[in-house]
Each structure stands twice: as structure tokens, then as C-alpha cells.
Amino acid sequence: PVARRKIALDKVVDLLGIGHLLQRPCATLSGGERQRVAIARALATSPQLLLMDEPLSALDAARKAEVLPYLEALPRELAIPILYVSHAQEEVLRLAQHIVQLAHGQVVRQGDAATLFNQLDQGFAAGNATAVLQGQLLAHHAQDHLSALGFAGGQLLLPTTPALASRPLGSAVRLTIAARDVSLSLQPLAHTSLLNSLPATITGLREDGPGQVLAALAVGESQLLAHISQRSARQLALAPGQAVFAHIKGVALVR
């Protein structure tokens, strides 16, 4: 009933950017446009909870990128919780506040993104481990087209993308660093093109596929993961408690 609606339809239309689609036949809409319209129809009933089961699974990467910002805005703008089911790690990292990981119908672990992903036994396929950092946008270095982001362990430099450039200084950011993009050394590297190197302490080691090792690292109050060869781990005599330097080849801004 109209009197019981908590979500104004006009606000939903504006939030999802579908005003220009309302007069078009569904058959003429792209996959991303159809998904946004479907979300609007669900929200028009003013639900107390929005259940989304693999909502982007049929979309290609471009259409996913089109829809994700709208999904990200819904809980914040409409104050409605979303139960989001997905096998896509990048979607979970982008959207989730609290994650429940299931295997064979049973809860394996749960927690916030940083707690869940920054563990040695995070449960994802070998070679796909990723660490999550919560940070803050500190500065833009216009001359170098770089932005500085601080986290509880130091600072990182990233290319100043349009998404970063549009954010105010001090805004919160979520970053991911794939374990395969982190290398280790026992001494600082001299004369390197790498922008991001941080002192760290090894907190754990485990096998991660044939001839591979996953290392858990404490960087200040934050956690990182490094995916290295078993041979490198042996040559460096890596062990828990050892001080190392983590050299980061890639950082992704996910939120």
C-alpha cells in the first residue's frame, strides 16, 4: 500500500539512474539496464530486507561495472540491509560489510572483509589469496599523478584514477592487495621502480599449491599476504617472527 511505503519511487528511480529508461520496452534494454530496473521493482515494494542471489552472474565485466556502484549506494542511501549471495570474490570485496563463508552448506567462517580475507586459511583457490586494507585518502601529488593513502601500517601510493580524484581528502577507502603481487626481501631494495615497500613481520607460512608458499605478514596493525615460491622461502630461511620487507607491485581500490 502507498501509505506504508518507506522508500519513495522517485528516489529509487534517481538513485538507480533509470529515469530515461521508463518509457522504453524491456526488449531494448541492455543487461545492466535490465538489472537496474529489476532492482527498482524490488525496492518499489519497500522491503525490510533485500535478498540478492547472484544478481550479476549473467552480466559481462562491463555491465557488472555499470551496476556495482548502484548496489553499493543502496544500503547507504535507503537504509535497507542487503543479503547478497555471490561466488564472485570481487563483488564481495566491493560490497560486503560482513561476510559469511559457506562450504557444503555449512558456515566455515564469518567476519568483516579484512578479518576474513587476511587469514592464511581464507579458503580461496590456491594462488588467489587477497588481503584487504581499510585506509584513508591523504593527498594527491598532481605532478606525478599519484595519490597517497594511509592505513594502519603506513602509506601507499596509487595512480590518481578519476575515482580517486573525485574523492575528498580524508575519505575512507577499501584497498585490496593480491598475494601474488607481493614479494619479500630481507633487506630494503635500492634503485627500484617499485613505489610501495613496507617493513613487515612474518606471522605464519603455509603451502599454497605445488612449490608455492603463502606468507602472512604483519605490517603495523594491518595484515598482508605474500605468495612466493617454496624455493624462495627456503633460500631466505623464512620463519614466523622474522623481519622482512614487503614489496608491493599492485594495489586495487575497490571502494
Regions found by a protein language model. Give the residues of each.
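Conserved ABC ATPase signature
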Residues: 25-29, 33
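A short, proline-enriched helix->beta-strand linker immediately N-terminal to the Walker B motif
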Residues: 44-48
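Glycine/charge-rich catalytic "coupling/switch" loops of P-loop NTPases
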Residues: 108-109, 155-206, 223, 227-255
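Conserved ABC ATPase "signature" region
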Residues: 4-21, 72-73
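Internal alpha/beta loop-helix hairpins
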Residues: 72, 76, 86-154
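Catalytic Walker B motif of ABC-type/P-loop ATPase nucleotide-binding domains
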Residues: 50-54
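Hydrophobic anchor residue at the start of the ABC signature
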Residues: 39
